[in-house]
């Protein structure tokens, strides 16, 4: 068992529970007849279940899961498609399924399924991955799931993460810098063109991109959309700015008192900045950096390519999600609606993140057994 990794994860989970209670107690008190711990309890039970599943997965040899790669991909597709007739709406988005009274977010299943499927696929291709056909075959595999997440669930952030996981796993198995440089330049050019079209359309009185177009315009000038799409961003920036170096103190945030909607979700990092200041924000970022470093150490020493790719996939998932969340909160990129791993409120998210950590711990355990 990699106790360094385990300690970091347990620390982030404990800190997350504290911040979930701090950020949600006001809203819970107003919504649930004075029950200020309502969100905290739900997150606590999800965390306990997740830890139990994590240890279960960690003690199973990771190669046990390889035959389930194709079924995992198929299940991911089916669950996303089931949102069309059976989707459960929450906070203005239809991204959940209700199963036996429990909400399940298929996007989280899809991320795990994609990691497992691509790791198995790349290993089975062998040296064929280095050919142009093999390279683009792997790159195309996540596209259907990414498109479904985007169009069916309006979840652009999860679509970006799924594609990001694929690109990172592909880069590790086939480090052809020219191809990746070309892909990166094309992605940047496409994003810049989209922003240019939306801005020009807005200047001429037109409308392009619907609510996503509004989000981009609000990102460029949040004060001009202070009563609409820019409201949450501005309130988050006020929270960050008012925290100073050491913060106002744990539980002393004013922005969580109805100013930042659902502060325990995507914008929880802004409350961390307000209550714990720059010091607390840097401490959280450092913990994620150490976590990613441990992933890199384990991947570099993995017993085989399949184990290394599993760890790289989990690394990509968590790293991209952390970067996107902090970038959104600080208004570095448009609002995409993405949670902060292990810290934001969300039972499905923490459960599947801990399953992924279980896979990483299983690979780490394989390293120790190999060295004996």
Can you describe what each PLM-predicted range is?
Residues 142-157, 239-255:
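Membrane-helix interface and discontinuous TM-entry motifs in multi-pass inner-membrane proteins
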Residues 321-372:
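A juxtamembrane structural motif centered on a specific transmembrane helix
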Residues 155-160, 248-253, 263-265, 282, ...:
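Transmembrane helix boundary and interhelical junction motifs in multipass membrane proteins
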Residues 240-279:
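Long extracytoplasmic/lumenal interhelical loops at the membrane interface
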């Amino acid at each position: 068992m990699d106790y360094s990794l385990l300690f970091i994860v347990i620390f982030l989970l404990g800190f997350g529970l504290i911040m979930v209670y701090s950020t949600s107690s006001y809203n819970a008190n107003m919504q649930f007849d004075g029950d200020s711990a309502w969100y905290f309890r739900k997150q606590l039970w999800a965390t306990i279940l997740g830890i139990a599943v994590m240890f279960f997965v960690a003690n199973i040899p990771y190669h046990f899961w390889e035959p389930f790669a194709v079924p995992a991909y198929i299940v991911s597709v089916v669950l996303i498609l089931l949102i069309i007739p059976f989707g459960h709406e929450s906070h203005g988005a239809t991204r959940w399924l209700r199963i036996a009274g429990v909400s399940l977010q298929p996007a989280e299943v899809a991320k795990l399924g994609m990691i497992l499927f691509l790791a198995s696929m790349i290993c089975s291709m062998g040296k064929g991955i280095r050919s142009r056909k093999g390279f683009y075959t792997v790159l195309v595999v996540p596209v259907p799931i990414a498109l479904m997440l985007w169009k069916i669930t309006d979840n652009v952030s999860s679509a970006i993460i799924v594609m990001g996981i694929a690109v990172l796993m592909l880069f590790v198995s086939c480090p052809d810098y020219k191809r990746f440089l070309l892909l990166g330049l094309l992605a940047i050019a496409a994003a810049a063109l989209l922003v240019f079209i939306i801005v020009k359309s807005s200047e001429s009185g037109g409308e392009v991109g619907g609510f996503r177009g509004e989000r981009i315009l609000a990102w460029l000038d949040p004060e001009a959309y202070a009563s609409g799409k820019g409201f949450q961003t501005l309130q988050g920036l006020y929270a960050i700015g008012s925290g100073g170096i050491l913060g106002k103190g744990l539980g002393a945030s004013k922005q969580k008192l109805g100013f930042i909607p659902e502060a325990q979700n995507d914008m929880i990092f802004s409350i961390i900045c307000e209550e714990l200041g720059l010091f607390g924000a840097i401490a959280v970022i450092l913990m994620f950096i150490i976590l990613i470093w441990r992933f890199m150490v384990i991947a570099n020493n993995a017993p085989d390519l399949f184990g290394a790719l599993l760890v790289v996939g989990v690394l990509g998932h968590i790293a991209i999600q952390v970067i996107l969340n902090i970038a959104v909160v600080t208004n570095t990129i448009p609002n995409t609606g993405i949670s902060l791993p292990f810290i934001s409120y969300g039972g499905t998210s923490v459960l599947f993140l801990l399953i992924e950590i279980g896979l990483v711990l299983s690979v780490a355990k394989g390293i120790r057994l190999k060295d004996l």
